[in-house]
């Protein structure tokens, strides 16, 4: 059992191996040590169990949770802050990013509505530090009609993040008509290409796992 999974079980969050089994995967894929001083944002507070799990595992870090339910303020404690607002509100997301960002780790465990997931990513990924991580949890809702989902349906979170795979390989997209001498020079491409707007150049990798998507910032 991983340390994170053990802590998750103690707090009763559904991220543990007793339910979704995300925490074992996080210890494998997240590039952080327990003693790192991280700035963490989690979308979706619910009963506060996940926030407490992050706090106890990353014990030197500051945790921010956001939720639309005002009752979630009760889960504030040392090194845990809770702000009330919607992940589908650009002004709210901008304000919390200015107040608390940039972030080392963002976890979207919010409404799981596909439009909300895509919207939050577009608003918040710019506020992830270089080398930081953005996680989308419970991405299986991309296939469920009640969450605006469907198999191969355009604009679901799964289809949105699939499309970003091309952006991970932006060198090929931007360099197809340039001298090959520059093919391995990402800094040159970023500084000199006139086609930067055609794709994101800030995504290092995207990992699709069972139930979660992990995006690493370049």
Annotate each PLM feature.
Residues 1-107, 111-136, 140-218:
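A short alpha-helical cap/connector motif
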């Amino acid at each position: 059992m991983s340390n994170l999974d053990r802590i998750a079980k103690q707090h009763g969050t559904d991220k543990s191996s007793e339910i979704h089994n995300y925490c074992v995967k996080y210890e494998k894929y997240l590039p952080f040590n327990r003693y790192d001083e991280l700035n963490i944002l989690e979308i979706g507070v619910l009963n506060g169990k996940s926030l407490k799990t992050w706090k106890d595992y990353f014990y030197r870090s500051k945790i921010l949770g956001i939720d639309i339910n005002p009752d979630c303020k009760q889960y504030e404690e040392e090194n845990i802050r809770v702000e009330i607002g919607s992940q589908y509100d650009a002004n709210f997301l901008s304000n919390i990013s200015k107040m608390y960002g940039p972030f080392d780790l963002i976890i979207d465990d919010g409404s799981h509505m596909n439009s909300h997931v895509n919207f939050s990513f577009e608003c918040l990924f710019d506020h992830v530090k270089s080398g930081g991580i953005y996680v989308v949890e419970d991405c299986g809702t991309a296939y469920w009609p009640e969450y605006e989902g469907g198999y191969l349906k355009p604009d679901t979170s799964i289809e949105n993040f699939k499309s970003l795979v091309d952006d991970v390989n932006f060198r090929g997209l931007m360099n197809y008509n340039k001298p090959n001498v520059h093919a391995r020079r990402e800094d040159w491409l970023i500084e000199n290409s006139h086609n930067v707007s055609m794709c994101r150049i800030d995504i290092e990798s995207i990992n699709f796992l069972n139930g979660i998507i992990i995006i690493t910032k370049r």
